[in-house]
Amino acid sequence: MTELDSLWEAIQNSFRKSKGDTTYKNLIAPAKPLDFANGRLRIQLPSQYHRDFWEQLTDQVVEIVYQRTGQEIRPDYVLATDPTPLAQTPPRPQSTFKEETPLNPEYTFQTFIEGRSNMMAYASAFAASESPGDQYNPLLIYGGVGLGKTHLMQAIANNMKFHNPSVRIKYVTSENFMNDFVNSIKSGTQEEFRREYRDLDALLVDDIQFFASKGETQTEFFNTFNVLYDNKKQIVLTSDKDPREIPNLTERLVSRFMWGVPVEITSPALETRIAILKSKAEEEHLDVPNDVLNFVAQRINTNVRELEGALMRIRVFSELHQQPITLKLATEALQGMVANTETTVTIDLIQKRVATYYNINQSDITGKKRTKNIVVPRQIAMYLSRELTDNSLPKIGKEFGGKDHTTVLHAIDKIERQVQEDARLQGDLVKLKNDLQA
């Protein structure tokens, strides 16, 4: 085996262990070593997309080779269509703004676990990536933290790049957009800013809720949105809540956001949580028994991020104690986390506690009766559902017998006003909150 073959085998083996199977198959395996001489390792890649990905791995490649040979090398990435080393290619014209925030190549549709809680969002995102600028434009994905919004957004970009590596995509957070806009005003480069954000095939903006109260930024984004939409360019947005619930967001911007397809992601159901854990375990090459997967999924019912965090905690605990992963070990590893998640407040729990407190049935809370002894507890339950959970107004309305989100908003406003002058109501709310959060 030559030195080049030996080094390449070490690099491949390292990434086969550290990257998911999908990433390895699609982005690592297609690379080919060309030669290794004078401290330079030339690696041939099939597309610019692959080269962008490997450039993010440079530090890891250098470390792997150093551990193997004691040499500090420099990787050069070349395209199969143009074997000239990257270092010798003419430099691109420098721009004040980044073309995009680097995408995570592991955020693909193949690695996203689909379930009832995200089925509509998944289908809409995939359709938008296959036919950008068409029926699903703009695409707005909203929901709580750690439920997969960013994963789906980047999966759209990765799929578009897979089909067309030269596609112009800009993926930013709303804060990135605002900072770039402010800097363009300070530096007098607004026209360049507009070219950067409008001469695109797709614009993806994460966390649009941070546009709230930013008047000039909202105006600039409104104009950018219109240019892209009129030119049939794909727009994808994410938010932690329904835009209609975001305070200090202009009506015309909310209207634009709701033009296309707004889809909500909610907390995953039990079977989806198990599938997520199983997929993560396979990706990390962990041997996790089914009873452990079920144990974790039943007790961590909030979001994907916490599920995966729990699994990694079990892994560290297993390695630290040099013991295989068992139900007993998992219980010990998650002792603190499980205690916290078992008290998660849900709409159903709120309805039950409020019904018990006011000596009525839960079916009265979700029903249509309009007598005062039922209407007030129902409004209190809606108010607490908004305050103690991450659910949107439409979701809350659905859980209260299919009420419209405006009915929920009215109930919340009424309780907020009444609690200012009703000491008894204040006391009731304090007792209910303490009971729910105990």
From Swiss-Prot:
Region (Domain IV, binds dsDNA): 319-438
Gene: dnaA
InterPro entries in the cross-refs: AAA+_ATPase, Chromosome_initiator_DnaA, Chromosome_initiator_DnaA-like, Chromosome_initiator_DnaA_CS, DnaA_C, DnaA_dom, DnaA_N_dom, DnaA_N_sf
Sequence similarity: Belongs to the DnaA family.
Note on domains (UniProt): Domain I is involved in oligomerization and binding regulators, domain II is flexibile and of varying length in different bacteria, domain III forms the AAA+ region, while domain IV binds dsDNA.
Cell compartments where the protein resides: Cytoplasm
This protein's name: Chromosomal replication initiator protein DnaA
CDD domains the record matches: AAA, Bac_DnaA_C
Species per Swiss-Prot/TrEMBL record: Limosilactobacillus fermentum (strain NBRC 3956 / LMG 18251) (Lactobacillus fermentum)
Subunit-level organization: Oligomerizes as a right-handed, spiral filament on DNA at oriC.
Any GO molecular function: DNA replication origin binding
Function: Plays an essential role in the initiation and regulation of chromosomal replication. ATP-DnaA binds to the origin of replication (oriC) to initiate formation of the DNA replication initiation complex once per cell cycle. Binds the DnaA box (a 9 base pair repeat at the origin) and separates the double-stranded (ds)DNA. Forms a right-handed helical filament on oriC DNA; dsDNA binds to the exterior of the filament while single-stranded (ss)DNA is stabiized in the filament's interior.
